[in-house]
């Protein structure tokens, strides 16, 4: 446990700078809203998207006063919803506002479209997400190098970059007593991104410790620090909140301290439609972007060195396709001339969420959240032999079916991905599902299968980037194990709600409640899940960073294969899903890619 002395010391280290209302107004006045002020001009780097990764890279590049950076963001800085953004306890209230992109999928397995939540504004999805701060398993990141050929993308390297981003705040003794744990060696204390316990000042619910006691009796580890490289068991987690419990989004982290840099310009209210190229003997060279609001009102701006796409896993693939980079079949159908043949928009991997919720009695009231990172056996329980058999016998069939459905274009390469996932689950004790429990007068589990075998796609449907005609097709549950895993995790959440020490606080289930029999089997749970799931909004890999022969779109420095001066630097490039919330990975990834960009800049200077 962290001593009182160490807690006090770390709290003092992590004290944030407080920005006054006048400074906030000054930020607003510094942002560009008139596209004519940048149209036709040349910058060293143009970044398409002012979200987590785009702002991180912009801040690092513009540390060099000689480097001129332009960020183009569709949204704005803060908004009329600012108060909701700042309060992490208001999670969900921001959905459907002007800060939510609210992309729609094609009709899914239940014949309904689903909404993909994604932030719009300076900060991107850090404006609207749940602020959860965890790290993946070491073996997952190591596989990026060992399995996918991305030299330098291993746990040891990424761990240092992730810590470099972090400004950690240790838990107090009261927070430790409630269920937090802190290992100082797993955190960074000199970064920009605040992390620390969520605490609204109310008494702590005893339910977090009850869940830990219940799972501990089953031999499951409890009260862990989920930032050390092996997230397993049950513990409370950290959040991106400063010491005043204000959301520490990427806009606050990177724009507020740096907006006065004369070499950093940020254009808001404009969308990057496509990349501009010059043809060279070595292939297309990115020389700028076309941006605007519609086909009749758009502008060109130029990049001396590089164009960096940071529009997110749903949009960066579309920008590439509008620019002529992608599968010929997709581009031909949209009437776009192909410049480079790459599997853009394939291999998209998102997770699915269901909810199991119950009332609690008066003894269980209080604040708090706890997370159970459950392994394959813990999720499937008595069904483990059947689930294991699927992994040991169905990979070839799944790869063939996925390619036939348009989720990937190479059976052999996809099977390598599947074998990697199988090994994680059966040999490495990697967390397979996350059960996220919230209290505050209830026992509410939001839960998801972390390691999906389904592969979706996102593609353009026309040549006009400002019409927003596209097909986002996650293809949820078209893999049988994904559906069984989501059903089993949901069943487990119901069981835990009334098991062991949890039983004393249980006062009746509300979701699924009477909609599903108390003794429902896995098949019945599967039927329920199909009708009641939602996307988890953690999509990755639509511009996969891996060897080209495995289906890669970008290389180990995030450069788009077959082009010059073009990189993708956002959440579309991780080659795998991870057993974690994704912000820590994205921050570390952005810092690592920024170093690669700066290294190339130094060579050209």
From Swiss-Prot:
Keyword Protein biosynthesis annotated: no
Transmembrane spans: none
Binding-site positions, FAD: 52-53, 73, 125, 129-130, 132, 272, 571, 583
EC nos: 1.1.3.4
Keywords in alphabetical order: Cell wall, Cytoplasm, Disulfide bond, Extracellular matrix, FAD, Flavoprotein, Glycoprotein, Oxidoreductase, Secreted, Signal
PROSITE patterns: GMC_OXRED_1 (PS00623), GMC_OXRED_2 (PS00624)
An example molecular function term from Gene Ontology annotations: beta-D-glucose oxidase activity
Disulfide bonding pattern of the chain: 186-228
Cofactor: FAD
Glycosylation sites: 111, 183, 190, 213, 278, 335, 375, 410, 521
One Gene Ontology term, aspect cellular component: cytoplasm
Catalyzed reaction equations: beta-D-glucose + O2 = D-glucono-1,5-lactone + H2O2
SUPFAM superfamilies on file: FAD-linked reductases, C-terminal domain, FAD/NAD(P)-binding domain
UniProt-annotated catalytic positions: 538 (proton acceptor)
Signal sequence bounds: 1-16
Entry similarity comment: Belongs to the GMC oxidoreductase family.
Role summary: Glucose oxidase catalyzes the oxidation of beta-D-glucose to D-glucono-delta-lactone and hydrogen peroxide in the presence of molecular oxygen.
Assembly and binders: Homodimer.
PANTHER family: GLUCOSE-METHANOL-CHOLINE GMC OXIDOREDUCTASE, GLUCOSE-METHANOL-CHOLINE OXIDOREDUCTASE N-TERMINAL DOMAIN-CONTAINING PROTEIN
UniProt protein name: Glucose oxidase
Species the sequence originates in: Talaromyces variabilis
């Amino acid at each position: 446990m962290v001593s009182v002395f160490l807690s006090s010391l770390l709290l003092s280290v992590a004290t944030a700078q407080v920005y006054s209302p006048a400074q906030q107004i000054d930020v607003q006045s510094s942002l560009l809203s008139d596209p004519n002020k940048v149209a036709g001009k040349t910058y060293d780097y143009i970044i398409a998207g002012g979200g987590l990764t785009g702002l991180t890279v912009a801040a690092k590049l513009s540390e060099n006063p000689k480097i001129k950076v332009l960020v183009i963001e569709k949204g704005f800085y803060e908004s009329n919803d600012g108060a909701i953004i700042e309060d992490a306890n208001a999670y969900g209230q921001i959905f459907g506002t002007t800060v939510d992109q609210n992309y729609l999928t094609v009709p899914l397995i239940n014949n309904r479209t689903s909404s993909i939540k994604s932030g719009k504004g300076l900060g991107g999805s850090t404006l609207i997400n749940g602020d959860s701060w965890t790290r993946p398993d070491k073996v997952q990141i190591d596989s990026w190098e060992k399995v996918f050929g991305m030299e330098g993308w291993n746990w040891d390297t990424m761990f240092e970059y992730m810590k470099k981003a972090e400004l950690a705040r240790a838990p107090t003794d009261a927070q430790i007593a409630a269920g937090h744990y802190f290992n100082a060696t797993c955190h960074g204390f000199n970064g920009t991104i605040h992390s620390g316990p969520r605490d609204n000042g109310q008494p702590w619910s005893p339910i977090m410790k009850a869940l830990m006691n219940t799972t501990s009796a089953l031999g499951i580890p409890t009260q862990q620090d989920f930032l050390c490289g092996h997230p397993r068991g049950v513990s409370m987690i950290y959040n991106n909140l400063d010491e005043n419990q204000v959301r520490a989004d990427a806009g606050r982290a990177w724009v507020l301290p740096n907006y006065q840099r004369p070499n950093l310009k940020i254009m808001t209210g404009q969308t990057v439609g496509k990349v501009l190229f010059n043809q060279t003997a070595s292939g297309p060279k990115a020389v700028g972007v076309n941006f605007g609001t519609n086909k009749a009102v758009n502008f060109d701006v130029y990049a001396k060195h590089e164009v960096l796409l940071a529009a997110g896993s749903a949009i960066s693939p579309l920008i590439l396709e509008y620019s002529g980079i992608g599968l010929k079949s997709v581009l031909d159908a949209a009437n776009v001339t192909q410049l480079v043949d790459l599997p853009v928009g394939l291999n998209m991997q998102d997770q699915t969420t269901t909810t199991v919720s119950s009332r609690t009695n008066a003894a269980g009231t209080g604040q708090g959240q706890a997370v159970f990172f459950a392994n394959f056996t813990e999720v499937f329980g008595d069904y483990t032999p059947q689930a294991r058999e699927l992994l040991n016998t169905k990979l070839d069939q799944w790869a063939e079916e996925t390619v036939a459905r348009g989720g990937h274009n190479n059976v052999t390469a996809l099977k390598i991905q599947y074998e990697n996932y199988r090994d994680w689950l059966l040999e490495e004790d990697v967390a397979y599902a996350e059960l996220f429990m919230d209290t505050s007068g209830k026992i509410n589990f939001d839960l998801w299968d972390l390691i999906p075998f389904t592969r979706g796609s996102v593609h353009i449907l026309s040549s006009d980037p400002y019409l927003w005609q596209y097909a986002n097709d996650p293809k949820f549950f078209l893999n049988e194990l994904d559906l069984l895993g989501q059903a089993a995790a949901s069943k487990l959440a119901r069981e835990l709600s009334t098991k062991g020490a949890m039983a004393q606080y249980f006062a009746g289930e509300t979701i699924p409640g009477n909609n599903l029999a108390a003794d429902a089997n896995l098949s019945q749970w599967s039927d329920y899940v199909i009708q009641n799931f939602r996307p988890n909004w953690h999509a990755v890999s639509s511009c996969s960073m891996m060897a080209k022969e495995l289906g890669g779109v970008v290389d180990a420095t995030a450069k788009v294969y077959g082009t010059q001066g073009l990189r993708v630097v956002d959440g579309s490039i991780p080659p795998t899903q991870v057993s974690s919330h994704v912000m820590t990975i994205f921050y570390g990834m952005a810092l690592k890619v920024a170093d690669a960009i700066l290294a190339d800049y130094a060579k050209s200077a």
